[in-house]
Amino acid sequence: LIHALLGAVPEQFHWILELAGLQGAASLGLSEMDEVLNANNFKMYENEVLFLLSFLQINLNNNSELCQKYLNKIGEGYKENILLNFTAARLLHNLGQNDFCLKVLENRPSSESTFPFYYLDYLQGMSYMYKLDYDNAKQKFEYFINNFKGKNYIKSTYHKLAWITYLRGTEDNYFNSITNEGNASIDEDKVALRDAERNYITHNRLLRARLLYDGGYYEDALLEISSFKVVGKNSMYFDEYWYRSGRIKLELDYDDSEVINNFEKSYNIGKSTANYYAPMSALQIGLIYEKQNDFSKAESY
């Protein structure tokens, strides 16, 4: 674990590790923990190791085959152990298997026998959102808001409730709640606050396409985004449109040239704005060229 965490330290801070005589590599730490997972004499720690390995893998290497391996190792354990339920749900989301993720969350151990883990209600609400099931999503988000006594994910939850009313075409000013409730320590809450301060929600078709994409429903996302009209009145959304189109087509194994073309359009349109679509498009192009072993182009992007 220490090797993995030290290996995750950004390069600009390696001098601190060297000063302290420390060294590590994420791949080394993960492989060492993988050995622990398979060792009979550490069987008593299997659940904890599975949890740590899964989240380190998602955040450091993001190897789909290993994520699937850990998911298989969990098996039906998610029904009996709340930690494994959380782990399985995050692995499945990372693998784009939202229907299975929802099944896992719906079949978690009863909260009567465990300390309440309200974040799982938030995750379940998100899983419903990815299916565009607004009724069930709203129910879960409201349950989370009414029961969770912490500060994180509160703004984010109100943000999702604002999305639901917007996508339904109804009126309800959740933006006031985003501004006044919770805090903005984590990224999800920061994004919610920023959008509330700007009174901004993207085009409804792009938002639906984003949600479907995040749930792994790539064909449905493509169908949704294809109905977006690339016309002058929608010009403020063009950088997002081309970025999301590129991401969807990348998952659907479209030809690299078409995917790159989409990302280049997003980059050229958005590079003079504060939106994140241009830099993210450049990153995706760089990753494609890296995969093609065209390292000079990859580095330039």
Regions picked out by a protein language model, each given a short descriptive name:
Residues 24, 61-62, 96, 132, ...:
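Residue-level detector of the short coil/turn that links helix A to helix B
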Residues 18-23, 37-42, 71-80, 106-116, ...:
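Solenoid-like repeat scaffolds
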Residues 1-59, 65-73:
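Short coil/linker segments at helix-helix boundaries
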Residues 21-38, 138-149, 155-187, 264-267, ...:
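TPR/TPR-like (Sel1-like) alpha-helical repeat modules
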Residues 1-5, 52, 87, 119-126, ...:
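"A position-specific structural signal for the A-helix of alpha-solenoid helical repeats
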Residues 3, 57-59, 92, 128, ...:
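Residue at a conserved register position within TPR or TPR-like alpha-solenoid repeats
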